[in-house]
Amino acid sequence: MHFGALGDIHGDFASARRTLERHPEVPFWICVGDVADDQGRYEPLPAPLYWIKGNNENFDSIAAAELPDSLHYLPNGAAADIDGIRVAGLGGTFAPTLYDTPAADLPHPRKATAKATVLADRRRHFVRQEVEACKALNDVDVFLTHEAPRPYFAGDGPRRNDAGKAPVNEVLAALKPRLHLFGHHHRFTEQERQGVRSIGLDLVSRSYLLIDGRTLEYEQKIPTP
């Protein structure tokens, strides 16, 4: 059995749908976040998709569980057993000023416009409480994050900054999953962090993975037009 992995979707459900329809033999797919479109909408897909939050989601829809039946949201710090594969995740981005805030208290005030409300919604972040919950999990096969671990250098210039986040490394060191997948940066990368294979996924329109359910060896695939 193989399962699939998608990078950030950003509302490109047409590309996601084509990929899933190309592989009717794949029983389920996982995704590293940023699923919603610019209007906060989610569309059904032809196979189950298990996903963590990115920083671009409709957090009201997630909180109310108002999602298509094929989209299965994985909350931070919890594990799900999917066809014999144990998957857990730490979705969202890192904000140092909010890191010690309880997850339930992350602010999401209503503003005068819809755009301002979205920008003010801090539920896009993960917090220490959720990192500790992830570190306490056991026997995780695949760990999903939206952020990259350190070091992660985006771009090619000489003054590149490390865009990785240390809490991700902390979880990898404690959890030791068999495979780590992340998104956010829209680039396919392969590295090892804390003794764990750590793979950055590209946008759904540019590539995806098929993963062997026994060995967790993967193959990068390029979508067909």
Can you annotate each of these PLM segments?
Residues 10-16, 35-41, 55-62, 78-81, ...:
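Active-site environment of divalent metal-dependent phosphoester hydrolases
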Residues 17-23, 80-83, 131-137, 215:
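Short amphipathic alpha-helix with an adjacent loop that forms part of the alpha/beta core around
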Residues 36-84, 96, 101-117, 121-122, ...:
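Ligand-binding grooves and catalytic loops that recognize ribose/phosphate and carbohydrate rings
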Residues 10, 14, 137-176:
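Active-site-proximal segments of metal-dependent phosphoesterases and phosphodiesterases across multiple
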Residues 85-158:
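Active-site-proximal loop/helix segment associated with metal-binding centers of metalloenzymes
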Residues 5-7, 29-34, 49-56, 73-75, ...:
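Active-site neighborhood of phospho(di)ester-bond hydrolases with catalytic His/Asp-centered motifs
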Residues 1-45, 58, 138-139:
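N-terminal active-site segment of His-dependent metallophosphoesterases
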Residues 80-83, 169-175, 186-225:
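Binuclear metal-dependent phosphoesterase catalytic core
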